[in-house]
Regions:
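Glycine-rich dinucleotide-binding loop and its adjacent helix/turn
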Residues: 83-206, 319-342
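A conserved FAD-binding loop/helix module that cradles the flavin
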Residues: 135, 347, 358-391
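Small-residue-rich anion-binding loops in enzyme active sites
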Residues: 53-91
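Cofactor-binding loop segments of dinucleotide-utilizing enzymes, especially the Rossmann-like FAD-
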Residues: 131, 222-224, 361
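FAD-site-proximal beta/loop scaffold in flavoenzymes
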Residues: 94-122, 257-261, 277-365
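Redox-cofactor binding/interface segments in oxidoreductases and associated redox assembly factors
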Residues: 74-76, 98, 128, 297
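A Rossmann-like FAD-binding core segment of flavoenzymes
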Residues: 8-19, 30-59, 69, 74, ...
Length: 397
């Protein structure tokens, strides 16, 4: 490949071509994801590299199996486990979903592409619960995806009417489906009309004004904006999200989800909170009710430490994360910093010098976001190299 332009695709119609997973849906949309294909090629073109799918580590392949097959080191980079669910009444009704599930469904299925038949429905108004970068990313993605979703629905609806007639197309819908379809159709026609007027007046279409009119997207966070992880980790993302029209409702703690006559989410009720002079958060009696046809929970995740429960004789747990060891096999408590003075990423050391390391959301120093995961790899690769120097290679080829 002589020119990188040969690899670049339009981001709106791009087919996933990196390593998938959180590399696709956990990185801000402001980063050119064409680079994911380039990163994969940079690794995959190297002769010693191989990538095998369909293998569940801890099931298909155990730790002992891996070492018996000649692997000199095992690096665990399996990311987060299950998302944190908020234990509130009606917290799992239709319309409520994990933010990571929405992002994964959007990015990995290509739901936003015109030629995709992926079923990913989101309605407005939408409320995102949480204050991290995932919450920010989810809010901006919902705002960007909604117009594409309803316009695609209208295009296919009109195509089917042309082929089969309106009565036939609508015959199979129940009352709720009819209401949702009419909502999407009216919104799509309003967007289409705005685009036509904008073209006639030679100006950009004001799609955001329409989205705002239909309820828009609000982030609800239990503390202040300046306390949120997204602000402390990357305030620029917050600034850009607010510039795109995202609303931020601070000092609100969810208490229940209200439903409509069909059992679908209609509102989210929240308690107001206040910061006291001694630095504690006090829950007030005041209750706020936010309209919400889509409620996306971005309240963090649990580390994916199931392997420690499956093989407890080889991996230990320290609080919620894997137990870390130094290079002499002594248990240590890692420094809670993305740039620790001394890096501790080893989870197991064998007598022959071979070892297991752990990164990203598995590690207390680096858990929480993709930036931390990348930092863990950068900080830890040198230690892996040093450990490999101690071991006679199982295969010199």
């Amino acid at each position: 490949i002589r020119d990188i332009a040969e690899l670049q695709e339009d981001l709106g119609n791009r087919v996933m071509a990196g390593f998938g997973g959180v590399a696709e849906y956990g990185i801000t949309v402001r980063w050119d994801k064409n680079f994911l294909k380039i990163l994969r090629l940079l690794v995959q073109r190297r002769t010693p590299f191989s990538m095998l799918g369909g293998v569940r580590f801890g099931g298909t392949l155990s730790i002992d199996d891996a070492f018996e097959r000649g692997f000199d080191h095992i690096a665990l980079a399996v990311g987060a486990g299950r998302p944190t669910l908020i234990p509130i009444p009606m917290g799992l009704v239709r319309g409520v979903r994990a933010a990571s599930d929405f992002l994964m469904g959007l990015q990995l299925t290509g739901a936003a592409r015109d030629d995709s038949v992926a079923n990913l429905q989101v309605r407005l108004p939408a409320v995102v619960v949480g204050g991290g970068l995932t919450a920010i990313d989810t809010a901006t993605e919902v705002l960007a995806y909604y117009p594409l979703q309803v316009e695609k629905f209208l295009m296919r609806y009109e195509t089917l009417i042309g082929e089969r007639g309106e009565e036939t197309v609508r015959a199979g819908w129940d009352r709720e489906e009819t209401a949702i379809a009419d909502e999407f159709i009216s919104h799509a026609r309003a967007i289409r009309a705005e685009r036509a007027v904008a073209e006639h007046e030679d100006r950009p279409p004001h799609i955001f004004r329409l989205l705002k009119k239909w309820g828009g997207v609000t982030i609800a966070y239990r503390k202040r904006l300046i306390d949120s992880p997204s602000y402390t980790l990357n305030h620029e993302e917050v600034e850009k999200a607010l510039g795109e029209g995202i609303e931020f409702a601070e000092c609100l703690n969810p208490i229940s989800v209200l439903i409509d006559e069909y059992g679908h989410a209609s509102h989210l009720t929240l308690n107001k909170q206040r910061l006291t002079r001694d630095g504690h958060w006090l829950t007030l009696d005041d209750v706020e009710k936010l309209p919400a046809r889509a409620i996306l929970i971005a309240a963090g995740t649990q580390p994916n430490t199931v392997l420690a429960r499956e093989e407890p004789d080889k991996l230990g747990i320290d609080d919620r994360y894997f137990q870390a060891f130094d290079m002499d096999g002594v248990p240590v408590e890692p420094e809670l910093s993305k740039k620790p003075g001394e890096v501790h990423v080893l989870a197991n050391l064998r007598d022959d010098g071979r070892a297991i390391s752990f990164f990203g959301d598995l590690h207390p120093s680096f858990a929480g976001n993709v930036v931390g995961a990348m930092a863990s790899a950068r900080q830890g690769y040198a230690l892996i190299s040093e450990m490999l120097q101690r071991v006679e290679p199982a295969n010199r080829d």
